[in-house]
Amino acid sequence: MASKDFAIGMILSQIMVGFLGNFFLLYHYSFLHFTRGMLQSTDLTLKHLTIANSLVILSKGIPQTMAAFGLKDSLSDIGCKFVFYVHRVGRAVCTGNACLLSVFQVITISSSEFRWAELKLHAHKYIRSFILVLCWILNTLVNITVPLHVTGKWNSINSTKTNDYGYCSGGSRSRIPHSLHIVLLSSLDVLCLGLMTLASGSMVFILHRLKQQVQHIHGTNLSPRSSPESRVTQSILVLVSTLCYFTRSPPSLHMSLFPNPSWWPLNASALITACFPTVSPFVLMSRHPRIPRLGSACCGRNPQFPKLVR
């Protein structure tokens, strides 16, 4: 009983911390939008990332907490379909935005070379349309079949194989459409993870080469303090590594392989699924020694927000 109470407390704490962290960043970028008139392309990407993070945390954490308290039949059939759909779309948008951040940062730190200059200009110009079309509209359409494979606990589908998610059930009378849907989602995940891996390797290579060039020009007596571009790139590398780790963690794989997991793997999977949306805003803010105070903006003073990513 004490262990279950501890798990419930962990889920509730994660919901509160993750939601507040993402709300703070969303407020930050909304403040910049209304005071400066327009956000930079990367700022808009991070704004969409905070929205997607909040959707993942709320759509996964709240129903899982209710199920942990024993309220497994609290969601109706429509409620289960809606919660699962929002969660899948939010998680896909998180992955897409992380991919955008890594690719865009490669373009940014490589812009000193002539062949990247024109690409950077086009990236700044078309990044808004790319986010809206690819990360939201595309993922909304791709996941449109998710509600067809989810039902409430009290209205389970008569199928030979039903997945138990604690607060909802998943299954289908026909396995062929569901299999095609899984293949499509997996293909998109593999594509995004592949791009992030390639971009991360490129960032490491470019930073190493720039460091060697600086050492060659100024000698080895350099300050240990890294440049702003290096700190931003390191933050994005941590974000990408966190996303790749938690999306392929053992509890998440356990949920995919076993249709009816026990209580602990079920809640462990919920905790790990929401780890990236919870951690990512603090990773972005941690590179600044002084985080801007929310109260100063609420009181009408200019808090001098630093730019998280250039």
UniProtKB/Swiss-Prot annotation:
Compartments where found: Cell membrane
Domain of life: Eukaryota
InterPro entries tied to this protein: GPCR_Rhodpsn_7TM (IPR017452), Vmron_rcpt_1 (IPR004072)
Membrane topology: Multi-pass membrane protein
Record topology, Cytoplasmic segments: 27-50, 113-129, 208-235, 285-310
Transmembrane segments: 6-26, 51-71, 92-112, 130-150, 187-207, 236-258, 264-284
GO CC entries: plasma membrane
Entry keyword set: Cell membrane, G-protein coupled receptor, Glycoprotein, Membrane, Pheromone response, Receptor, Transducer, Transmembrane, Transmembrane helix
A molecular-function term among this protein's GO annotations: pheromone receptor activity
Gene3D superfamilies reported in the protein's UniProt record: Rhodopsin 7-helix transmembrane proteins
UniProt-annotated glycosylation sites, renumbered to this chain: 158
Pfam families, per database record: V1R
Example GO biological process: sensory perception of chemical stimulus
Extracellular side: 1-5, 72-91, 151-186, 259-263
Signal peptide per UniProt: none
Protein's job: Putative pheromone receptor.
PANTHER family: VOMERONASAL TYPE-1 RECEPTOR
Family, similarity comment: Belongs to the G-protein coupled receptor 1 family.
UniProt protein name: Vomeronasal type-1 receptor 3
Lineage: Eukaryota, Metazoa, Chordata, Craniata, Vertebrata
Gene designation: VN1R3
